[in-house]
Amino acid sequence: YKISTENNIDYGLVNKDFKGSTNISVVSNNKKYKQLTIGIGDEYKIINRFPSITTAFSRSNYVRSQNIETAYRTELLNGLYSEFKFLYCFQTPIDNLDLSSDWFTSLDSVAELAAINFDPYRKMETRIQLTWLPFQKFYYKKNRKVVLGTKFPTINLIYRKGIPKLFKSEVNFDYLELGINDEFPIPHLGKSKWNFQLGSFINNKNLRVIEWKYFRGSD
């Protein structure tokens, strides 16, 4: 077994607030890969990870998230991995922060951007992901499986469910996504990557703006 931890700490000088997160993972690679992770945090999180240049640093793209999560990842068959994740969080806007001395406040004013205002809410979400690496090569070193990878594209199937009412959760949605990606070398230049994703909300009865699926903004 291998135990690892990841910790992040932030401190806002103007608002005098500590924020951060911590998680601990237990990994076993005896014959097949298994990993259990538990984490907790209070952070300012990005809403849209594919913004245009104008909104990349805008405070309108952030929200406060107090969260706790757990995830379990394992190899079902050679090259076929599954991950089960549960996330519970309390989402609140940051419109009550003092941003008068923030470097990007003037940019937000010019672009007429403001921190998103919404009613705080609780969210319970489960996420299931299947990842297939076709014809994955490997070998055993004692009882440890050493993965060499595959020369074929990686296929991902993701299902997200916003669970209503559980622990006062206020969301209700279902999202399904299929993705294919690959990385390949280019002689004398390095590596290149491509990624194709196709997804849709098959249920959006109670879908908040933070849970929307965003596309890359135009620059």
List where the protein language model places each region:
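Residues on the lipid-exposed face of transmembrane beta-strands in outer-membrane beta-barrel proteins
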Residues: 1, 9, 22-28, 40, ...
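Surface-exposed extracellular loop regions of Gram-negative outer-membrane beta-barrel proteins
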Residues: 1-10, 42-45, 136-182
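Repeated loop/turn-to-beta-strand initiation elements of outer-membrane beta-barrel proteins
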Residues: 2-5, 30-36, 78-82, 92, ...
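Outer-membrane beta-barrel proteins
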Residues: 14-18, 45-49, 91-97, 137-141, ...
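Residues that define the transmembrane beta-barrel architecture of outer-membrane proteins
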Residues: 16-20, 62-68, 120-126, 172-176
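C-terminal outer-membrane beta-barrel translocator/porin domains of Gram-negative envelope proteins
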Residues: 36-41, 51-61, 116, 158-219
